């Protein structure tokens, strides 16, 4: 970061900063403009006072001009955001496609779009998980249609496992939510996880922000219930629902250990006809187990409710519980503190992804790095020493 940008970012005046490093404001102005280069002692003071944000390279090397950034038309950005706010599904879908893209020029465009987004604390973010066959899509569609009857706009982000060949979604939830997908007040988007368990977090969060900007009142995020994506989704929603089948035990359910512990609400689905009794038994078993564990979340005892998504039975009670849960979180301020934590998590996920992309695109192609890899292959260099050399190279050349 150049010194001028740092001072503006931190709200520090030239006069105040010049005083801190023991020089005149005139000298500092000359350093900032590039008219003069600071002496070594001054550069070290500047680096120390800025916690390394401004380093010697920022004085000796001019920053690279990002052509992708230069070509972005700010008027077109404003038009995109305006169209999203006015309810254009086409513009919304295009923006989410940009979010999912790995192309640098698309990511630069996304950054500019997001800078114009406003904070939205009115939307309710609902995570829904459960093993394949539990009826997640039917549940979301049935509840979503009921919410639309209440004049609410509903969106669904369905996290599909990705095809390793194409990187695209395998399941495609639009085919399983036929009524909801064609409703003018609904928006459904299958979202591929990118072939790795952690790939869901950043892209899904950013897609969710697009939906909030478009004015959707309720956003469902559906996951498979068999991997680490559940933890990532749990950390970006306001309430997390775990759907169960009318049968006993986590083992019989096929649920990954620990997912039940994430639940804010447990729903026994498919309480239809002959399975009504089994659903009630499962409900009582989990209620007893939760009572024994005695671990309330957000001041709530985790509730266990039953429903039939197919017959739209029990959904009103589930929605009532969600509203009470959200209102209580807002009253005790955990709703807003959680949203702040989610924002920080997004920031760190963005940092991790940027560094990973840097490593994958640049570091792995470098000739010096290839030599290190060959030495590791030939047992001439330890993994620890190779890691140290690569990290030093990355720090010197990329940061």
PLM regions and their residue ranges:
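Short, charged recognition helix plus adjacent turn
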Residues: 30-31, 48, 54-75
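Hydrophobic positions on the alpha1 helix immediately C-terminal to the Walker A/P-loop
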Residues: 139
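Canonical P-loop GTPase G-domain recognition
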Residues: 265, 271-328
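A short, Lys/Arg-rich alpha-helix, primarily the initiator
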Residues: 1-20, 56-60
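Nucleotide-state-sensitive switch-loop elements of NTP-binding domains
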Residues: 75-126, 134, 143-229, 236-242, ...
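Short, basic-rich loop-to-helix N-cap that marks the start of a DNA-contacting helix
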Residues: 35-48
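Recognition helix of helix-turn-helix/homeodomain-like DNA-binding domains
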Residues: 22-37
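Long, well-ordered amphipathic alpha-helical subdomains in the mid-to-C-terminal portions
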Residues: 92-94, 306, 317-395
């Amino acid at each position: 970061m150049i010194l001028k940008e740092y001072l503006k970012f931190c709200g520090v005046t030239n006069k105040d900063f010049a005083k801190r490093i023991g020089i005149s404001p005139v000298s500092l102005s000359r350093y900032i403009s590039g008219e003069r280069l600071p002496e070594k002692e001054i550069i070290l003071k500047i680096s120390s006072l800025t916690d390394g944000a401004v380093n010697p390279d920022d004085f000796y090397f001019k920053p690279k001009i990002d052509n992708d950034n230069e070509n972005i038309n700010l008027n077109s950005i404003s038009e995109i955001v305006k169209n999203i706010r006015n309810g254009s599904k086409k513009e919304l879908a295009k923006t989410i496609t940009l979010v999912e893209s790995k192309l640098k020029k698309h990511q630069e465009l996304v950054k500019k779009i997001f800078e114009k987004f406003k904070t939205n604390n009115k939307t309710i973010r609902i995570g829904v998980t459960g093993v394949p066959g539990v009826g997640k899509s039917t549940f979301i569609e049935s509840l979503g249609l009921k919410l639309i009857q209440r004049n609410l706009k509903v969106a669904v982000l369905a996290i599909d496992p990705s095809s390793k060949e194409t990187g695209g979604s395998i399941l495609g939830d639009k085919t399983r939510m036929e009524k909801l997908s064609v409703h003018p007040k609904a928006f459904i988007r299958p979202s591929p996880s990118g072939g790795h368990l952690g790939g869901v977090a950043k892209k899904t969060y950013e897609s969710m922000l697009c939906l909030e900007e478009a004015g959707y009142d309720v956003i469902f995020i559906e996951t498979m219930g068999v991997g680490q994506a559940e933890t990532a989704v749990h950390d970006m929603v306001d309430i997390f629902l775990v759907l169960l089948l009318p049968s006993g035990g986590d083992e019989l359910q096929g649920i990954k250990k620990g997912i039940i512990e994430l639940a804010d609400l447990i729903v026994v689905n498919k309480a239809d006809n002959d399975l009504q009794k089994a659903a009630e038994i499962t409900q009582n078993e989990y209620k007893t187990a939760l009572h024994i564990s005695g671990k309330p979340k957000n001041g709530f005892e985790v509730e266990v409710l039953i429903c039939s998504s197919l017959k739209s039975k029990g959904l009103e009670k589930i929605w009532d519980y969600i509203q009470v849960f959200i209102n209580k979180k807002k009253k005790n301020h955990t709703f807003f503190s959680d949203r702040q934590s989610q924002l920080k998590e997004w920031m760190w996920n963005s940092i991790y992804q940027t560094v990973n992309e840097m490593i994958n695109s640049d570091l792995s192609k470098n000739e010096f790095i290839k030599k290190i890899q060959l030495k590791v292959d030939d047992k001439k260099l330890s993994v620890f020493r190779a890691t140290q050399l690569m990290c030093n190279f990355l720090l010197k050349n990329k940061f």
